[in-house]
Structures are given as C-alpha cells and as structure tokens.
Amino acid sequence: NVFDEVLERLRRTGAVERVSWYVAGRSAYRRWIEQGAQATGEVVREWEVVERGRRRTTSPAEIAAWEERLGVDTLWPALVADRRMTLGRLAKIRQDYTPHRSLTELRGIAVETAETLWEAFDRARPDVVLGFVPVTVGDYLAYLVARARGVTVLP
C-alpha cells in the first residue's frame, strides 16, 4: 500500500506525530486491516458518511453556508468528480447513465461529507494532507476543507 510506505518513510524522519485516514473503498480497507495494517488515529469511512448523507435533508441556506466556508461557488464538482455518486458504485466497470441517486440525496451526501471532514480536521489539526487525484467526493471535499483552513495538500 502506497500510503503505508509513505507513512513509514515519514515516521523514520520523525515528521509524523499522528495520522488520520479517509477511506473510500470498504473491501480494500477490510483487506488492508486483515493484512495487519495499523490504522492508528481517526478513520473516516466514506460508506458510513454517504449513508448518513443519503438520509439527510439539506436546505439551500445550509448548502450556501458550506460553499461560502469552503470558498467555492458550488459543491457540485465534488459530486461530479465521483462518478459513483451519480452513476452508482459499478460506474467504473459498466457504462450506464441511469441516475443512481436523487438530487436530494446528492445534496445530503455533499453536506454530510463536508461537515464530517471539517469536524475531523478540527480534531486532527493536520499540518499536511496526503492524497491522490481527488476522484471521490471525500477526496475532493478534503482538498477544499484543507485549502479553506490553510493546510498544505500533497497530491
């Protein structure tokens, strides 16, 4: 796992005090843990956040408040970046343009994810965020949260 390798190298330099995780793939996360990984620190599990978001009702004012806090015109790109949100979890395997979630669910997912990540940043107080290209709603919003808080992001 590339994150394990990067973390180990950073730990050897003494540059890491604590680590938090945002994990998007449930089965990959399970395999990682079964292989003996030590997910020290807080773990934000995307599938739990998405499920809470799907049940959440949001108002235009709440969405606007998050857009202002994150310094963006709209939260929509975070959802569009993650084709699983609009086209389902098999979107990367099968081409099917049937909408997978309602607009209400998507709004709830965006706000729930932003709120969860903002609170996780409050607890962790990170100096740096490591990630790949932001292709999940959480990756994208973590980047926006980090940027809004002045935290360095290393893709």
Regions found by a protein language model. Give the residues of each.
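Histidine-anchored nucleotide/phosphate-binding helix
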Residues: 1-14, 141-144
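Gly/Ser/Thr-rich loops at beta-strand to alpha-helix junctions
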Residues: 1-2, 25-29, 132-139
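Well-ordered alpha-helical segments embedded in enzymatic catalytic cores
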Residues: 2-5, 112-116
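Conserved N-terminal ligand/cofactor-binding loop architecture of enzyme catalytic domains
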Residues: 9-112, 155
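Conserved nucleotide-sugar donor-interacting segment of glycosyltransferase catalytic cores
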Residues: 116-155
